[in-house]
């Protein structure tokens, strides 16, 4: 066990990193995509929603690719881009918020895993918050902890296997629905404006788009996976390749999974299928074996994503600690170059959170929504940094990407990131500010122990701390007086 000062073992290639990106994006939610998308939209609106989301996310994905090439010195980008562009406190806050977000997200995977097991062993794991479910989820938290402790490279190899295994059922689903596809059914009520005795119209295309894009917005959380692990990448180009490969691959799967079922089932039928709806669709098309296959795929998908996020979630505080922004204890590695203390602390917090799930499912669902919003400022800060850096004289114009391309990529990524934050909801954003403010004492502690204490507590950094603290107090007031509710 030793304290790392920024020399992580660089042994992850483009395939391993792409596996990280795909696995972190494709979790259990994809197996419910047909119903989620059809619930309030016709096929036409769904195609438009994916087109618009794909364009927006392309700019974010390309932001990460460009930054990995023009600033390869800034490893673990989500945190480092924010710190480099906007100072130590913004960097800390982005890292802190991202870390909390993924801690709660990983506990969400524990809940989903146990709930998925309930299909095979009812009713012991129903809802994912029974006593057997809490015990099972807790065991898995520590199993993944020890897998990652054995080494990031080994864990990444297991993750690649898991990614392939969860893609197989999805590919089978796509093939079956493609063969069952009938153009006449697909064209029926393409824009969702038909009215029947039992089925009202779905509304305007605009309203369908709005409701559907709330689903597509969250489908790409995890696209930053390769960037977060860039300190362990074999080369900067591997990070960029993995990010774009993961983006294109996932977008293709999402579109096919959402659209092809409309060629064999009508919108109202898809909207009424219980989740995971991929199992329900195959159950209707091929029978029981298809339903079982998709439920097994769901379980593998959740476990694989959970492993990816276990690797990622410990990397942020670890990297922040290596340059003094997080408390030094997070920088301790083991002999396999895994962030030992960061993993243990993260897993311990996940374990504590897991216990709370047993007592309050509704509060837990609310917390997941809040922490989902907390990842979005990381995208905004990265995009803003690219836009800012593209206009800097230090930008390598003779490098792999021209400055004007970087500038427009950053600009449109900023616009789309702001849209994501707006769509997340003001109430959740304000609650997330309260959670961000909880990190202030840890920032102060790290700053006092840093060799760059003056930088940590420069006037502009103190001003930022005061602004976050005041916003948190305002949020507490608004929630306590019920002027804003979750």
Swiss-Prot record:
**Extent of the signal sequence:** none
The residue ranges crossing the membrane are 12-32, 41-61, 85-105, 129-149, 160-180, 211-231, 242-262, 296-316, 341-361, 367-387, 418-438, 461-481
Q: Record's InterPro entries?
A: AA/rel_permease1, Amino_acid_antiprt, APC_superfamily
What GO terms fall under cellular component here? Answer: plasma membrane
What is the protein's membrane topology class?
Multi-pass membrane protein
* Coiled coil spans: none
Q: Which GO terms describe its biological process?
A: amino acid transport
Keywords recorded for this protein, A-Z: Amino-acid transport, Antiport, Cell inner membrane, Cell membrane, Membrane, Transmembrane, Transmembrane helix, Transport, Virulence
* Annotated localization: Cell inner membrane
Q: What's one GO MF term for it?
A: antiporter activity
Family stated for the protein in its record: Belongs to the amino acid-polyamine-organocation (APC) superfamily. Basic amino acid/polyamine antiporter (APA) (TC 2.A.3.2) family.
Q: What does this protein do?
A: Catalyzes the exchange of L-arginine for agmatine. The arginine uptake by the bacterium in the macrophage may be a virulence factor against the host innate immune response.
What protein does this entry describe?
Arginine/agmatine antiporter
Organism annotation:
Chlamydia caviae (strain ATCC VR-813 / DSM 19441 / 03DC25 / GPIC) (Chlamydophila caviae)
